[in-house]
Amino acid sequence: RASLPASIRRTPLLRLAREASEVGKEKLQLKAECLQITGAYKPRAAFAVINALSQESLSKGLVLTSSGNFAQAFAYAGSYGRIPIVVVMLDTTNPYKVDMARNFGAEVVFCGTDALSRQATVERIASDRGMTAIDTWEAQPIVAGHGSLGLEILEDEKEIQTVLVPVSSGGGAAGVAAAIKQSRPSVRVIGVQPERANAAYVSLKQGEPTAIDYWETIADGLSAVRPGEYPFRHLKKYLDEIVLVTESEILEAVRTIIFRAKVIADPAGATATAAFLAGKVETSRRTVAI
């Protein structure tokens, strides 16, 4: 955390009452990373990666593939340090996400419509331009950078009993879980995934990273078809469990966050809250949802 720049916000914990009778005695708080610079927690990891690289590597730039939050995170971190950033995206990427990456200073390179072509394009650009390729699924500093989230929660809520964290490829959840369990083992850390994008859930059941055949969820930020090898080891070691939520439960969480907390979270950002609101976890415990 000490290496993160001042522009990375220490986001607040927002109390969320499910109904009027809970006001003043809320069990649920939201770690509002939707208020983070770029609108998500990924810049924490992007800066951790950059801080781990040599000045020579940074001067030549970084190349990665991302369809959303990591693209914006590295674009922002790169502009902060005047580091060239190239992001490889599919032709079908949401135009808003393309524009946001460009607005933060990244060069966007399209690679067609085949998802398997993304990594090959990254490797070609890295070779042609002498850039450093970043694997956002396996880079160890990414897990460490996300750990800052867990530490902030422990510092800001001394009586916390449960932390709910959304899971996709696993880097964010792995970092949060490792930081919390190493600091305060009694706190339960529970991962949350959409029922229709449950690769990490399946992988924990199988005991190894396992790919799912497809995903279909409104929470497209949690659409990894397989967890990364490195983060999976942390998930297996530190997560207490993963629970699943339905599409309707995710949408209801988005609605509740808007009306009760007065902030806007996208479906991926509302997924952890959905587990609490739908009773997928013990709701009598003091809980933080990321």
Stretches with model-predicted labels:
Residues R1-I290:
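PLP-dependent amino-acid enzyme catalytic core
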